[in-house]
Amino acid sequence: MSDYKDTLNLPETGFPMRGNLANREPEMLKRWYDEDLYGEIRKAKKGKKSFVLHDGPPYANGDIHIGHALNKILKDIIIKSKTLSGFDAPYVPGWDCHGLPIELMVEKKKGKPGQKISAAEFREECRKYAAGQVEGQKESFKRLGVMGEWDKPYRTMDFGTEANIIRSLGKIADQGHLLKGFKPVHWCTDCGSALAEAEVEYQDKVSPSIDVRFVAADEAATLAKFSTPEGHQGEGELSVVIWTTTPWTLPANRAVALHADLEYVLVQVEAHGEQKAQRLILASELAKSVLDRANIEHYHNLGFAKGSDLELLQFNHPFYNFTVPAILGEHVTTDSGTGIVHTAPGHGQEDFVVGKKYDLEIANPVGSNGVYLPDTELFAGQHVFKANDSVLEVLKEKGALLHHHAYEHSYPHCWRHKTPIIFRATPQWFISMDQAGLRAKALEEVKSVEWMPEWGQNRIEGMIEGRPEWCISRQRTWGVPIALFVHKETAELHPDSLELIEKVAKLVEEKGIQAWWDVDAAELMGEEDAANYEKVLDTLDVWFDSGVTHFSVVDSREEYNFPEEERTHSADLYLEGSDQHRGWFQSSLISSVAMKGKAPYRQVLTHGFVVDGNGRKMSKSIGNVVAPKDVTNKLGADILRLWVASTDYTNEVAVSDEILKRSADAYRRIRNTARFFLANLSGFNPATDIVPAEEMVALDRWAVGRAFAAQQEIIKSYDEYNLHEVTQRLMHFCSIEMGSFYLDVIKDRQYTAKKGGHAQRSCQTALYYIVEALVRWMAPIMSFTADEIWNEMPGEREKFVFTGEWYQGLFDLAEGEEFNNEFWTEIQAVRASVNKLLEAARGEKVIGGALQAEVTLYADDALIAKINKLEDELRFVLLTSAATVKPLSEKTESAKATELDGLFVDVAASEAAKCERCWHHVADVGTIEGHEEVCGRCVSNVDGEGEERKFA
């Protein structure tokens, strides 16, 4: 016999080396949906302990971006890992469907409601537009391998959800948290609507910084408050000086505010050149800086007074014909300015609070479009930001402008329009943070939640401690109505508001939100009441829509109908970007505490934003945008999923072509490891060929033990949401424990041992156990590839890997086992040391390959005792044709030191002939009649009982 190739156990599998994921994944997706994979998972997990990850709804507008992909893939990985851990973990994806961005898109095509199109038609067009956007995003998410209730997602515009949003408002009102007030709110003049805190972002803006004089109305009364030397009361006009960066708010000024405990100085500005004599009141600490910037060099102090002494003194408005009082406020500081604060209660939260205390007029001369109202003296019809220059001109004319310069500062902007916003007092509906103890209860509930990372707790506590009332009303067309009736004269809520809300909710459940605008009040409350009450026509903040989904979705959908005793909270986990501490996490917490007295979630996990390889934000103008569709079309979704799982997503997450290439390289290593397992399981039937654990070759037992240890760590990391630890452990297992050692050592035995003999079957048993575990470790992350592996594995099995649980067939090495982990760790160290010398010998042309070598190991007694346990099988571990062990005392001069203490190695080229079958150089090659080209071991493996392997 001269061709021994057919006698080898060569690897064979239908699992290709190349993933070709971009082409193959869509075929797998089709099968998943044709065979209802998600439905199969639900059936398999029915009755198991529940795990609810509630999906924060993305906005139904535009294509998905890489941040969406990161978020949805993270959720999908966690859901799938929980499923494998034996939980019933449904996933109902959601969409936020009301609000301004959708209105703006529809306005472009159809015009503004009430002009070219009726409000009812406009709402219908918004609904159609949002539905189309949902469908587009849905297909993109499905392509990423995300499993869920895609046929029945939740949309905040679904009639049932809209009805439940209205019911949520009723519950909050019933608990005493609803408030109507005329208050300053963040107002976007482009939106023409109030904004929630979460809709405000801060950007740098250049504004005029001005110091303005308010002349004392009663000079004598003002002077009397200062401890001036007798007869030295100074000369010139007497004024307080305020500082502001919003000159446009001066028409609404109704007071100047001082701090009760601050010291104020009366400064005499001396006549000098063009400088007229005048007297200025300033905070002592700030006087020098104010005078310096006004280029006033010649001055002296006349006297001092406490802020509390100056309360209720009157000063002339700088350009209107009325006086304003000096009032006291804790918000006044000496951080900047003059120590005296211009107070316009209609244009600032602190001004409003202090104005209420002094019963000041809440002047609001600005319309919803940011233009001064027609009756605004001097400035009617001007846009407020353009009016700054006009205000400065008037101040100069009146001689009231002490100083001005351009000032760059952080200023609130609309998150949609990216334009500066204003504070504007309007009648609005609020959820009060304090009138029924909501703030205190919310802060208490924060402590009951597990925040990951931990800093999330401090962040949200700080935000809740400092936040104003939640303005929930909007002056928009496309939104859930604030379905309340108020008395036409007293503006009080109808006494039966809760019952009326339920009636409206039932109508909305049937016909959608348009029902509110269509219904006649008399139908709900009778003619008599209808004559005295009117509908509220405002809509709800979209953050309210999404914030109450713990009730409108989780508490209401059949998918989440788990036993009450399992449900400590509506959801187990909320997982979103770190910006949601001020957004969805907070709106959900506040609404849930207001409705139910407890947090809506047990755990909150946040991820960072996606940046490019240089840490820059994604931007079309920079050209660094990575689109999910481009990645899936080029590399496949599994590469994107592996990228997500490989990052420490609690910080910023970097992505670039180079980073994705690294993910693709890591993927190839894992895929090739899996392919080795599958190819070497050819001809193996688990039903008949499994070798009992106690009869397995020692090295095979060790490999299964390593898989057992890896699985424990991997499951723990999945449970703790440390996905990058999962991928690190997976890579280490595949590349180091398997690839660099075990798989390398077993190739000889696997390929050359007797087909179906104990030596081969022991090895295949280990490979089978390991791939059964490996495919499950991979499934949450590389879902497509895991499915592909699953379908190539031997033995009877369920249709999908995703319906099962972690593999239970692995075992750990028994305690006290002779060939334990410590033993194999030392053997690997010996092998690594020998390998370095083999490489050197190859470089020096002493040998061609490792199998041409014979090595002699000179070792100390302790090491010899370990190495000799492998007997003649040491050579198989070292991949050499022969390996001899001798005491250190017999070391020859040619033996070289290794990195291991107590080990020297001599490498020599074997003089024996090469076996044509196993390629080992063995002395008995050519001595066996009829088999002159092969060694005795191969003859036994081909025609005899096969070699015996105990250790390796």
From Swiss-Prot:
- Localization: Cytoplasm
What PROSITE patterns does the entry give? AA_TRNA_LIGASE_I (PS00178)
Give the reaction(s) catalysed: tRNA(Ile) + L-isoleucine + ATP = L-isoleucyl-tRNA(Ile) + AMP + diphosphate
Protein keywords: Aminoacyl-tRNA synthetase, ATP-binding, Cytoplasm, Ligase, Metal-binding, Nucleotide-binding, Protein biosynthesis, Zinc
What GO molecular function terms would the record report?
A: aminoacyl-tRNA deacylase activity; ATP binding; isoleucine-tRNA ligase activity; tRNA binding; zinc ion binding
Q: Name one GO biological process term.
A: isoleucyl-tRNA aminoacylation
Q: Which cofactor does it need?
A: Zn(2+)
- Positions with a binding annotation for L-isoleucyl-5'-AMP: E576
User: What are the binding positions for Zn(2+) in this chain?
Assistant: C915, C918, C935, C938
Q: Where is this motif: 'HIGH' region?
A: 58-68
Q: What class of enzyme is it?
A: ligase
Q: Name one GO cellular component term.
A: cytosol
Q: How is the cofactor bound?
A: Binds 1 zinc ion per subunit.
EC number(s) per entry: 6.1.1.5
A Pfam family assignment: tRNA-synt_1
Residue sites binding ATP per the record: K620
Tell me, how does this one assemble?
Monomer.
Query: Could you tell me what this protein does?
Result: Catalyzes the attachment of isoleucine to tRNA(Ile). As IleRS can inadvertently accommodate and process structurally similar amino acids such as valine, to avoid such errors it has two additional distinct tRNA(Ile)-dependent editing activities. One activity is designated as 'pretransfer' editing and involves the hydrolysis of activated Val-AMP. The other activity is designated 'posttransfer' editing and involves deacylation of mischarged Val-tRNA(Ile).
Q: What is known of its domains?
A: IleRS has two distinct active sites: one for aminoacylation and one for editing. The misactivated valine is translocated from the active site to the editing site, which sterically excludes the correctly activated isoleucine. The single editing site contains two valyl binding pockets, one specific for each substrate (Val-AMP or Val-tRNA(Ile)).
Database matches in PANTHER family: ISOLEUCINE--TRNA LIGASE, MITOCHONDRIAL, SOLEUCYL-TRNA SYNTHETASE
UniProt-recorded name of the protein: Isoleucine--tRNA ligase
According to its UniProt entry, this protein's organism is Aliivibrio fischeri (strain ATCC 700601 / ES114) (Vibrio fischeri)
Q: What is the lineage of its organism?
A: Bacteria, Pseudomonadati, Pseudomonadota, Gammaproteobacteria, Vibrionales
